[in-house]
Amino acid sequence: MSKNSVIIVAAGKGKRMNSSISKQFLQIKNKPILYYTLSKFSAHESIDEIVLVTLEDKIEVCSDIIDKYNINKVSKIVPGGKERQDSVYNGLKAVSKDCEVVLIHDAARPFVTSDIIENGIRCANQYGAAACGVIPKDTIKIKNEKEFAIDTPNREDLFIVQTPQCFNYNIILDCHEKLKKHNKKVTDDTMVLENYGKSVYLYEGSYSNIKITTPEDLILGEQILEKLT
């Protein structure tokens, strides 16, 4: 029977947080951010396994969190690579061979909802590739190299991409292998497919599905958690 797998990418060092502790291990309400992220996917009935990708020297820390909070769907913890795309590729190689749909998610994005997960799986099955996100609330400007505004895109045409990003496993693995062969650099997994002419369906995420990257995000995260509990 085919599986739905999720790769949680927790290999970042979080330089923008100005902390010696990686952002996924910082705490909100006395629990690490990674706990909230893992527990959301572990509790979801459509998720069969979790592959956690982290820094090699943080594997034991992650294992302790998994054991402490009894997160039972983590099948493997694997070391990350030099860049995010290398970490994702390591995760793709580690998922079960009968995986059909794989979701790729930021460890520092702990407020993903059950609906976002379910819709991602559905859209990946239907379209082959999908990513959640939101329309920007602010007006966006395009600037030139001299810092002057040169254009104002229609907000309705813009989309702030979040995670999970969800794919047919064979499609995303094939594109990542091509990317590695051609030595191309990307900032997220939708770009991996776009590099090879594949379309990515965009579906509704949530303004609360934030990535905790800065100290200000940590404060906002506490407020979001207050509303959710």
UniProtKB/Swiss-Prot annotation:
Pfam families: IspD. Disulfide bonds: none annotated. Belongs to the IspD/TarI cytidylyltransferase family. IspD subfamily. Transmembrane segments: none annotated. This is 2-C-methyl-D-erythritol 4-phosphate cytidylyltransferase. GO terms for biological process: isopentenyl diphosphate biosynthetic process, methylerythritol 4-phosphate pathway. It is an enzyme of class 2 (transferase).
